[in-house]
Amino acid sequence: VLAVIVTVLGILAGIPMAIIIARKTFGKMPSVILDSLMNIPIIVPSIALGISLKFFWQGSGIPDFALLILAHLAITYPYFVRSMSAAIERIPIELEDASKTLGAKPFTVFKSIILPLTKYSILSGAIIVFTRSVSETGATLAVTSTLQTAPVLIVNWVNSIRVGPALVGVNTQTVGLACGLLILFSFIVLLALRLLTKKGKA
């Protein structure tokens, strides 16, 4: 559920930002600055980002689940924006200019030109956001101790086996099976992403 919400929010917020960066809506320098800012969550360790969010919003009354969504969105958002902005930059600006000359409004331009030509990039970006959110551990551990995602649950299982006492029904076979399922899931998603990328280039 968390990854789905983060993916939807990432798409809704990422498309406008990608257009602003790719088309230099506010000028060249602001676009360069925004593009550079997109790299920060990619460079900074996720646990550091999670801790900073926790300290910043601590005591604000925001529910842990909402804070977790915010943390995952901050981490995954740049991946979608960079993927989408690169796709938009490949679209000749003359197509949009011609459409605007004929009286098309910005949303019509997006719906008739940008969306059809970037649909595979949107889908591949969404897959990246989804898988990144599913696999995120550091920020989740930093933000909340009450909510557990699959990777955090596996970490807790491993700690219970190493430190003890082991949780009921949890052993090395259980942990191995859970890790194997996550790896299989990642492989399937990456394979789908690869096929989508090839289809988009065709």
Mark where each language-model region is.
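Hydrophobic alpha-helical bundles that form the membrane domains of multi-pass transporters
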Residues: 107-108, 117
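Short glycine/proline-centered loop/turn elements that form peptide/ligand docking sites
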Residues: 91-95, 106-107
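Structured catalytic cores of enzymes that bind and process phosphorylated ligands/cofactors
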Residues: 103, 152, 176-178
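Glycine-rich helix-loop "coupling/hinge" segments at transmembrane-helix boundaries
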Residues: 137-172
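Membrane-water interface segments at the C-terminal ends of transmembrane alpha-helices
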Residues: 1-89, 113, 117-137, 142-145, ...
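Short hydrophobic faces within alpha-helices
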Residues: 40, 94-102, 175
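Hydrophobic positions on the alpha-helical face of helix-turn-helix-like DNA-binding modules
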Residues: 98-99, 109, 113, 154
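Glycine/proline-centered hinge or cleavage motifs at structural transition points of membrane proteins
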Residues: 102-103, 116
